[in-house]
């Protein structure tokens, strides 16, 4: 019941339709409406339906690597369901708070059995620390690998073409439009430096490393250089 083809078939892409049809019966009837409203929020430009479609499309291509693609798909649908860049007091909201809120929202609408629900919860929570998160419980044989695949998918946009990478940076800038330019550039540079410092360990699986790692580091190096020039220019004009 949770998914209506009549209502959504003209609005959303095939990966969304197909994967939601796979897991709709393990959600309450309001779940898709909640997700749909979230990813259409006007303050989003990167963390919107485009991001979800991208991840589901890649999951579909790489599903032979997954033990439970249905659970990975559920985590994809919910992992950015709550995305707010600043709190009511105007301060930067930590990503971890959005992740926790997204996991809680999933639990509110889930009808998965207890083991599967906890696995999805842990997949979502792992996005609070992409580079260092590890499975602490093997919810099913192969869960650790599914977690690694899910996190690699979420970072796959780093290995996009340069033009898409640039567009993603612009989309993120829109989401943080309230942050002054010097602070935003410094924050982006710190994030990119962290990704770049991980070398081949940026991606966890051999298969995804071969797909995205080389291009990702080319993009990161180019972005580092451009952001450093921008930071220097902003500092000199201050």
Give, region by region, the residue ranges found by the protein language model:
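Divalent metal-dependent phosphate-bond-processing catalytic cores, especially two-metal-ion Mg2+/Mn2+ enzymes
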Residues: 2-19, 40-47, 58-68, 78, ...
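His-Asp-centered metal-binding catalytic motifs of divalent-metal-dependent phosphohydrolases/nucleases
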Residues: 55, 69-87, 102, 122-128
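Alpha-helix N-cap and coil->helix boundary residues
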Residues: 30, 67, 71-73, 97, ...
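Short alpha-helical hairpin
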Residues: 21-37, 51
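An active-site-proximal "capping" alpha-helix that borders the catalytic cofactor pocket
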Residues: 55, 95-111
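Polymerase palm active-site segment centered on the conserved acidic dipeptide of motif C
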Residues: 105-132, 136
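Histidine-centered active-site/metal-ligand motif
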Residues: 47, 51, 79, 98
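Metal-dependent catalytic cores of enzymes that make or break cyclic nucleotides
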Residues: 88-94
């Amino acid at each position: 019941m949770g998914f209506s083809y009549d209502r959504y078939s003209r609005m959303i892409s095939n990966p969304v339709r197909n994967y939601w049809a796979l897991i709709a019966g393990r959600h309450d009837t309001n779940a898709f409406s909640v997700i749909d409203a979230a990813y259409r929020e006007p303050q989003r430009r990167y963390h919107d339906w485009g991001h979800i479609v991208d991840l589901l499309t890649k999951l579909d291509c790489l599903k032979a690597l997954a033990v439970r693609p249905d659970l990975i798909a559920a985590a994809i649908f919910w992992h950015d369901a709550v995305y707010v860049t600043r709190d009511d007091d105007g301060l930067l909201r930590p990503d971890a708070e959005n992740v926790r809120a997204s996991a809680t929202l999933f639990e509110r609408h889930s009808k998965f059995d207890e083991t599967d629900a906890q696995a999805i919860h842990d997949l979502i929570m792992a996005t609070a620390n992409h580079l260092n998160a590890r499975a602490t419980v093997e919810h099913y044989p192969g869960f650790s690998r599914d977690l690694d695949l899910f996190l690699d998918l979420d970072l796959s946009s780093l290995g996009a073409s340069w033009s898409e990478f640039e567009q993603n940076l612009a989309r993120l800038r829109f989401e943080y439009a309230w942050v002054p330019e010097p602070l935003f550039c410094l924050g982006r540079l710190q994030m990119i430096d962290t990704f770049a410092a991980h070398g081949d360990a940026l991606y966890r699986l051999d298969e995804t490393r071969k797909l995205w790692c080389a291009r990702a580091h080319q993009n990161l190096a180019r972005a580092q250089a451009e952001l450093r020039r921008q930071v220097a220019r902003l500092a000199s004009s201050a």
